[in-house]
């Protein structure tokens, strides 16, 4: 074979092994379908839309619920220095008088336990405290002489109570809020129950409260607050501890930052709340959150020192003066540390 023939043969062999010509058959490849991805994206988008609608709907409902809270005209309140925030403000919080059965007739009578509390937030936005005033302590009620504190409400209105406490303490009160304990069961159920501590076993309405920690649902929370075997002042402590337990759980479990739980919790709160007419919707929500934060700190809950003269409960003037100064100077926690006997016990009788 000549060299020329060999080269031509090799060239033909190389051509046959080379790339396919334009006329050669190319294997068919099925295009991958994008339909599953499209369906997934549409589904995800729909879910996101539903979530957004649900969140917007939740906040709209919450705003409506807060707007529906009764507003009360209360004279004697002082406009806050920083109205855009709740820092450096003092709130007067009361409850309807609650007797052993909680009937309307009992709510119009004196002598039953009722909550009178000054809730103060520090000006720096860090901390504060709650000061409970016994409703049966005798003080000067303007226009009525020396009377039990709660009579200021019974004989007048929230305005007279504000005037009485301002005269007693020298503390400017910025806002007023009133709780209705007849609706406490709904709130306790909405947050999934609470825990309270009882120092000794008791029995009320046929329900046994064991010594130590008790898990309360809505109904048993009412039993706890109205136990007829507990005297009035101790029943007041139970109500305060129940309020503290409720708002502690709301804060610790972040129930007001979760859109799912927020609606149910705020709905329950608004059903038992009335506030002064200067309260804005954001003020109310902020108050609930701030109260919850402080509720977890037992050192910031104190009871006004009193003493007994004859058969009457009267202020302990010397200690009380220090407490009023502590409120004005944002130092309730320091007062409680100096005077531990004034700290409200979490284990109410």
What are these regions (language model features)?
Residues 1-41:
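Terminal targeting segments of Actinobacterial cell-envelope proteins
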Residues 28-125:
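Entry/capping segment at the start of metal-dependent catalytic domains
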Residues 69-74, 79, 86, 99-100, ...:
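C-terminal solvent-exposed extensions
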Residues 86-89, 111-116, 125-128, 133, ...:
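Extracytoplasmic
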Residues 102-107, 147-155, 170-175, 226-234, ...:
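Second-shell loop/turn segments in exported
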Residues 150-210:
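Amphipathic, coiled-coil-like alpha-helical scaffolding segments used for oligomerization/assembly
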Residues 186-268, 273, 348:
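Flexible, polar/acidic helix-loop-strand segments at domain edges
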């Amino acid at each position: 074979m000549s060299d020329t023939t060999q080269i031509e043969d090799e060239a033909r062999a190389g051509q046959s092994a080379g790339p396919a010509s334009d006329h050669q058959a190319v294997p068919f490849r099925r295009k991958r379908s994008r339909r599953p991805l499209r369906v997934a994206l549409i589904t995800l988008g729909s879910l996101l839309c539903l979530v957004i609608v649900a969140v917007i709907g939740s906040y709209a409902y919450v705003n409506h619920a807060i707007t529906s809270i009764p507003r009360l005209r209360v004279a004697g309140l002082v406009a806050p220095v920083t109205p855009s925030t709740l820092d450096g403000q003092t709130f007067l919080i009361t409850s309807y008088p609650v007797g052993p059965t909680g009937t309307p007739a009992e709510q119009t009578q004196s002598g039953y336990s009722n909550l009178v509390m000054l809730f103060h937030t520090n000006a720096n936005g860090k901390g504060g405290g709650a000061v409970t005033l016994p409703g049966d302590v005798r003080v000067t009620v303007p226009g009525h002489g020396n009377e039990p504190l709660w009579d200021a409400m019974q004989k007048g209105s929230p305005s007279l109570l504000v005037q009485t406490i301002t005269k007693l303490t020298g503390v400017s009160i910025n806002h007023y809020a009133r709780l209705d304990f007849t609706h406490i069961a709904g709130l306790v159920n909405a947050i999934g129950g609470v825990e309270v501590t009882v120092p000794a076993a008791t029995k009320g309405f046929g329900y046994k409260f064991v010594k130590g920690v008790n898990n309360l649902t809505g109904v048993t929370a009412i039993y706890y607050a109205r136990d007829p075997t507990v005297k009035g002042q101790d029943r007041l402590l139970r109500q305060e501890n129940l309020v503290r337990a409720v708002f502690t759980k709301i804060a610790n479990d972040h129930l007001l930052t979760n859109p799912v739980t927020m609606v149910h919790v705020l709905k329950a709160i608004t059903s038992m709340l009335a506030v002064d007419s200067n309260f804005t919707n954001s003020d109310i929500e902020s108050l609930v959150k701030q109260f919850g934060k402080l509720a977890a700190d037992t050192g910031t809950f104190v009871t006004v020192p009193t003493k007994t003269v004859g058969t009457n409960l009267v202020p302990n003037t010397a200690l009380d003066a220090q407490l009023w100064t502590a409120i004005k100077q944002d130092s309730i926690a320091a007062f409680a540390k100096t005077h531990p006997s004034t700290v409200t016990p979490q284990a109410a009788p």
